[in-house]
C-alpha cells in the first residue's frame, strides 16, 4: 500500500497518559499546598508586595535522581535558614534544548544510552518531583516539549521558556495556559525584545491543540498568564549590569509591564565559564544592596561537584557532577546564597 506520510518515522511507541502517571505517582494535599503557596509567594515578589529575592538554583539538568535528592536535602536547609530574605527554589530541568544534537534530558533518555525509554523517564521525573516537594523544597523547570507539561506541571512552582523557544508562538501559547509564573529568556544573541513580546503574548487569551490528561486531543482555550517576566541571560555580551537592567526596565515600562526582572548568572552572563557566576553574583548583590528593587529573582547553575563531565560508554560517572553545562560546586553555592541574603537585608 502506498503512503504519503510517516515516511521518515522509524518507530512509534505507546505513551502512558498523564492521568495514568498521576494516578501511579499521586500528588498529596501537603505537596499541593506547598506548590500553591510558593506560586503565590513568587507572584508577590514579582509585584513588589514581598521584598524577598527569588533564587532558582540547581544543576543545569537532572541526570541522577539520587544526587538530585541529596542536593535538595542540602538546599532545603538553606531555604529554611534564609526564608525571611530569600524564596529558594530548586532547578529541576528534565528537558534540554540542543543547538544541534545531544542528550535531550532525563525524560527522553533516562538511561543516558540512546535507548529512549520515555515512559520510564516520565515516571522517574514525576517521582523525583514528588520526593523533592515532599521535603518542602519547591521545584522549577523549563517547559520545552508541548506535551510533557501535562505529566509534571502540577508539581512545578516556577517555569521557564528558554532562549531558543521564547520567540516560538506555540510556547507563548503554552505559557498563557501554565498555572505557575513563567520566565522568558532573552534570545541567544542578547535580544530582549523577543522576551518582552513573549510576556505580552502570554498575558493574552489563546487557543492551541494538545492532548488532555487522558490522551484525547483537545482544543485548549487559555485565560492568559499575568506573571510572565524576562530572564536576562546575556547574549554576545553579558547583560546583568545596571545599565542593561535600566534599559530593560524602560522597555517593560513602554508596554506597562511589571518593572521587575530576573538575572541568570550563567550562560551568556558568565561567558559560558561557570566560575564567573561568582562575579555576576557579586555585581548583582552590590546592585541590590545599593537599593535596586527591579531585580526580583536570580538563577544559578549549581550542583554537588564543580564543572561538568562527558558521558562515555563503560565509564562510571562522577557522582553529583553535571553532564551538560558546567556548574558551581556546593561550597560556592552556599557562599553565593549567603551573599544574596545579606544584600537583600537592605530592602528591609
UniProtKB/Swiss-Prot annotation:
Its UniProt entry gives the catalysed reaction(s) as: D-erythrose 4-phosphate + phosphoenolpyruvate + H2O = 7-phospho-2-dehydro-3-deoxy-D-arabino-heptonate + phosphate
User: Could you give a GO molecular-function term held by this entry?
Assistant: 3-deoxy-7-phosphoheptulonate synthase activity
Q: Which InterPro entries match?
A: Aldolase_TIM, DAHP1/KDSA, DAHP_synth_1
- GO terms under cellular component: cytoplasm
TM region positions: none
Listed pathway(s): Metabolic intermediate biosynthesis; chorismate biosynthesis; chorismate from D-erythrose 4-phosphate and phosphoenolpyruvate: step 1/7
Q: Could you tell me which cysteines form disulfide bridges?
A: none
Task: Please give the Gene3D superfamilies that the UniProt record associates with this protein.
Answer: Aldolase class I
The family assignment reads:
Belongs to the class-I DAHP synthase family.
Task: Please give the function described in this protein's UniProt entry.
Answer: Stereospecific condensation of phosphoenolpyruvate (PEP) and D-erythrose-4-phosphate (E4P) giving rise to 3-deoxy-D-arabino-heptulosonate-7-phosphate (DAHP).
Q: What is this protein called?
A: Phospho-2-dehydro-3-deoxyheptonate aldolase, Trp-sensitive
Which species is this UniProt entry from?
Buchnera aphidicola subsp. Schizaphis graminum (strain Sg)
Q: Which gene encodes it?
A: aroH
